[in-house]
């Protein structure tokens, strides 16, 4: 009987000790801090607190910038110019008539040009730009053809060849023009004020040397077109002062010959002005 009583007391003691400890409860993890990254900053919010701590990273990512350097020698193919041709007439028509180059009565008014119709078209096969100093100072050169069309206001003017003789005809044509085409090599010193920009601002100046490879007198009367091919005593070689102005995407060009365009008879200095269509 005593053994049974002692066993019951022992069992009750063990059961009460197990009842004091909850073995089914799961342990809760400790609260974590909130971390937010914005660019080069890290914002940390402490657990259970309204305070925020801002930490700046020491590492920065650089923006992707174009690092390509301009080439020291660049080539531009097939450049086109579109402008106007004219000339400064300082001819002595009395002397020209005496020499038999022009007919009596031919003067400055008879050889006056139509400003809006007298066109200049240049086609440059290529132009190159050579860097001299930091792409600000450059040398530009190339090769191409100059096409000059001198349209006369006087629709009765007539050009004869071998020998050259300019006279007043009786037929009134719809169009009368003298065309002079040159193979030309230009060379200019270029100043680029914005070398890192594609369409920047700059100016160029220099000289060009041209060779007259074709000339013709052309008339048009309705559907009838007549051409007389001859050099008409025009100078074979032409030296000109040339210039170019770059205003962003707009480019202007101009030229002024160094001397008279005729070998004899007349004294006319040609010049041109217009727009240039090129990459630089």
Where are these regions (language model features)?
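Cleavable N-terminal export/targeting peptides
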Residues: 1-67
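Short loop/turn motifs that connect adjacent beta-strands in outer-membrane beta-barrel proteins
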Residues: 66-74, 89-91, 130-137, 194-200
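Residues that define the transmembrane beta-barrel architecture of outer-membrane proteins
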Residues: 74-78, 115-121, 179-183, 199, ...
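Transmembrane beta-strands of outer-membrane beta-barrel pores
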Residues: 84-88, 129, 145-151, 207-213, ...
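Surface-exposed strand-loop-strand hairpins of Gram-negative outer-membrane beta-barrel proteins
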Residues: 87-120
């Amino acid at each position: 009987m005593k053994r049974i009583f002692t066993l019951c007391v022992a069992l009750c003691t063990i059961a009460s000790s197990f009842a004091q400890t909850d073995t089914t409860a799961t342990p809760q993890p400790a609260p974590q801090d909130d971390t937010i990254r914005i660019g080069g900053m890290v914002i940390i919010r402490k657990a259970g607190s309204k305070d925020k701590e801002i930490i700046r990273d020491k590492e920065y990512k650089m923006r992707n910038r174009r690092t390509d350097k301009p080439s020291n020698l660049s080539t531009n193919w097939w450049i086109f110019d579109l402008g106007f041709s004219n000339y400064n007439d300082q001819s002595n028509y009395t002397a020209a008539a005496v020499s038999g180059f022009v007919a009596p009565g031919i003067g400055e008014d008879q050889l006056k040009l139509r400003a809006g119709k007298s066109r200049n078209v240049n086609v440059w096969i290529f132009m190159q730009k050579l860097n001299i100093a930091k792409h600000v100072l450059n040398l530009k050169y190339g090769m191409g053809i100059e096409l000059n069309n001198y349209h006369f206001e006087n629709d009765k003017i007539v050009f004869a060849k071998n020998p050259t003789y300019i006279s007043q005809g009786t037929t009134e044509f719809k169009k009368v023009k003298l065309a002079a085409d040159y193979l030309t090599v230009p060379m200019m010193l270029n100043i680029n004020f914005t070398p890192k920009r594609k369409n920047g601002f700059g100016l160029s100046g220099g000289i060009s040397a041209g060779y007259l490879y074709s000339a013709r007198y052309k008339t048009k009367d309705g559907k009838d077109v007549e051409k007389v091919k001859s050099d008409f005593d025009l100078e074979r070689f032409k030296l000109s002062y040339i210039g170019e102005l770059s205003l962003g995407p707009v480019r202007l060009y101009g030229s002024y010959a160094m001397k008279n365009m005729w070998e004899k008879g007349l004294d006319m200095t040609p010049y041109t002005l217009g727009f240039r269509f090129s990459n630089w």
